[in-house]
């Protein structure tokens, strides 16, 4: 167990950040799954900007790597273009 006040505070902060990152990571994964499950192109096109915004924010705050965000955006764009 930590002995210093600052290390106790650090432990509290890390736990808060971990829960925050888990929540937004899970939310992002669910949004991507929902888009991939969509077969309607209009609906997918409407969802895409919100998901890209979410991916960019998570990459900026280091919840996910920036390359992962870019790869997901690229693959989702390809998926949307393939929809008829």
UniProtKB/Swiss-Prot annotation:
GO terms for biological process: translation. GO terms for molecular function: small ribosomal subunit rRNA binding; structural constituent of ribosome. The keyword Secreted does not apply. Signal peptide: none annotated. GO terms for cellular component: cytosol; small ribosomal subunit. Pfam families: Ribosomal_S20p. Keywords: Ribonucleoprotein, Ribosomal protein, RNA-binding, rRNA-binding. InterPro entries: Ribosomal_bS20, Ribosomal_bS20_sf. Binds directly to 16S ribosomal RNA. Belongs to the bacterial ribosomal protein bS20 family. This is Small ribosomal subunit protein bS20. It comes from Bacteroides thetaiotaomicron (strain ATCC 29148 / DSM 2079 / JCM 5827 / CCUG 10774 / NCTC 10582 / VPI-5482 / E50). The gene is rpsT.
